[in-house]
Amino acid sequence: MKAVTWHGKRDVRVDEVPDPTIQHSTDAIVRITSTAICGSDLHLYEVLGPYLTVGDILGHEPMGIVEEVGADVTHIKPGDRVVVPFNISCGHCGMCSDGLQSQCETTQVREQNKGAALFGYTSLYGSVPGGQAEYLRVPQAQYGPIAVSPEGPDERYLFLSDILPTAWQAVQYADVPDGGVLAVFGLGPVGQFAGRIGAHLGHRVIGIDPVLERRDMAARHGIETVDPTDIDDVPAALLELTGGYGAHGVIDAVGMEAHGGAGAAVAKFAQAATGMLPDAVAQKLIENVGVDRLTALHNAIGAVRRGGTVSISGVYGGTADPMPMMDLFDKQVQLRMGQCNVKKWISDILPLVDDPSDPLGVLDLTTHTVPIVEAPDAYRTFQQKSDGCIKVVLKP
């Protein structure tokens, strides 16, 4: 089968690899019909190479048709149309029972001290072959795959795999009161959906992003937008827009791809160095030096009102990043963050996705749909934010 594989920093290729097979009674094989490139895939493209091996199959936002199931998989059958959540969880351990599927005790990558295994996301998360391929072996398929309607385009359901529940969780974690103000830093795919969800729930939403195409897309869905490149002091501007109080909740949907700000020089050096050092040394650099650029997070902390909540959905990778602890403590700011617990939120989101009126605008996100053989070019376009690119869907 064809699969998108990692070959080095900014070097992904489409290779012919063996088709996956059932290995355990809880497995399923899914023929992929659509698979998206996630913003966090760019971390593999750029920074996290020390945890990858040449030939690793990427991708964690897939959906398709069930081809085969193991003996213990009974809730789906061959021919069903399913979305595959990006995290692999069992559904019956203590963590899953508590709605923390991203911390599943059955699939935790304990040797790396990490949570649940993820598709296509380095040795840190289990080195599980990913979904940017023609076929995917799905472990823990007795629980994970989400059966969806056979009707309608894939893009109506595809984003249930990751970014839509990630955005939903981010809004829930932001804890905005009825009629309150939600600010969203970063209007990439997760930020777009977070803003739309906030508006759907009745919040006033302010989105901050330097890219015109992203701001225009957000504005179509009732989100006020701010261009941070036109402003010297972003938190001060947000305070002015909110009567001097700040937002009740602020979402950082940017993560380590942000530019400038506190720690940026060290982070820029560390990110570049990971591509030049032996893997063992580069891993230590990532684990012990701040590799994140924290402008968005610092701005979020500055823009949130006293007693408010900062919700972090953007992915960060460093363990020694500087944080403004005095401001956090003095303002009594609450922080919530983490990998999305996809299955926890599906019962809330699926009816909205099924709704023909498309209240969350799931059909107005994808800007580029290309054959999987064009994945290398699509990665470059997505990373460079060129050609108005906001979201890429690959078709095997």
State the predicted function of each range:
Residues 174, 216, 224-334:
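Glycine-rich cofactor phosphate-binding loops and adjacent beta1-alpha1 units
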Residues 23-24, 77, 177, 245, ...:
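Residue-level recognition of short, solvent-exposed, well-ordered loop/turn junctions
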Residues 18-35, 48-97, 101-102, 129, ...:
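Glycine-rich beta-strand-centered segment in the early N-terminal region that forms part
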Residues 81-82, 134-135, 145-232, 236, ...:
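Mid-domain Rossmann-like dinucleotide-binding core that forms the NAD(H)/NADP(H) cofactor-binding site
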Residues 306-313, 323-363:
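Rossmann-fold dehydrogenase core element
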Residues 298, 343-396:
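C-terminal hydrophobic helical "lid"/dimerization subdomain
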Residues 211, 316, 341:
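Residues in the short beta-alpha loop(s) of Rossmann-like NAD(P)-binding domains
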Residues 92-185, 360:
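NAD(P)H dinucleotide-binding glycine-rich loop of Rossmann-like/cofactor-binding domains
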